[in-house]
């Protein structure tokens, strides 16, 4: 299956379009770029200048309030009759169910004419300002539910995306499973 899919990729013009606030999503985009045959990459960069005439789009986002960031949401709505692979990062991690909910929301931005080739998400580190805000919340006179769990999650996220996060993105997009959007 992977050989067939790789053959298809070699005969396509691919665009890797992403937005990365903290560098996490760019790490995933770089990994995808390294796996794709160089001669097939028509575009690599932000959605502002991305062409709309590639055959296959690898679209990366950072998570904003349980959804993709706005500029990627807008870009996804412009893509028609294309093959799409979604990838993203979220500061809150360790929960596949949470990632699946985000991906389902992001998929809703895609026109039904597109074919979703696959998707992948992993945890990403957050800016230190987030931890500082959590500590202020913890030390405030008003109790904040789950603040200790939020701080623990922040501390776990510091090393992500790591090698274990990057490895699957290299192979996940090569899957031959295609899901038509309904």
Describe every region a protein language model picked out.
Residues 31-39:
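A short, Lys/Arg-enriched amphipathic alpha-helix followed by its capping loop at the start of a domain
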Residues 133-145:
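Oxidoreductase cofactor-interface core, primarily capturing Rossmann-like NAD(P)-dependent enzymes
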Residues 173, 178-182:
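Single conserved hydrophobic/aromatic residue that forms the stacking wall/gate
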Residues 13-31:
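N-terminal beta1-alpha1 ligand-phosphate binding loop
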Residues 45-133:
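Helix-loop-strand module that forms the ligand-binding subsite of alpha/beta enzymes
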Residues 148-160:
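Short glycine/proline- and acidic residue-enriched helix-loop micro-motifs
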Residues 29, 162-174:
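Short, amphipathic alpha-helical "lid/cap" segments that border enzyme active or binding sites
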């Amino acid at each position: 299956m992977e050989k067939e899919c790789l053959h298809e990729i070699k005969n396509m013009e691919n665009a890797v379009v992403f937005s990365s606030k903290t560098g996490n999503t760019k790490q995933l985009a770089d990994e995808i770029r390294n796996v794709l045959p160089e001669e097939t990459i028509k575009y690599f960069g932000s959605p502002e200048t991305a062409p709309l005439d590639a055959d296959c789009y690898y679209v990366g986002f950072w998570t904003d309030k349980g959804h993709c960031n706005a500029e990627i949401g807008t870009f996804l709505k412009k893509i028609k009759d294309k093959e799409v692979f979604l990838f993203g990062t979220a500061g809150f991690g360790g929960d596949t169910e949470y990632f699946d909910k985000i991906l389902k929301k992001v998929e809703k931005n895609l026109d039904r004419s597109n074919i979703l080739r696959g998707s992948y998400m992993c945890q990403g580190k957050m800016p230190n300002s987030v931890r500082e805000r959590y500590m202020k919340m913890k030390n405030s006179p008003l109790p904040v539910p789950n603040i200790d769990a939020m701080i623990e999650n922040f501390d776990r996220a510091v090393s992500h995306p790591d090698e274990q996060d990057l490895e699957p993105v290299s192979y996940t997009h090569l899957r031959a499973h295609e899901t038509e959007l309904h």
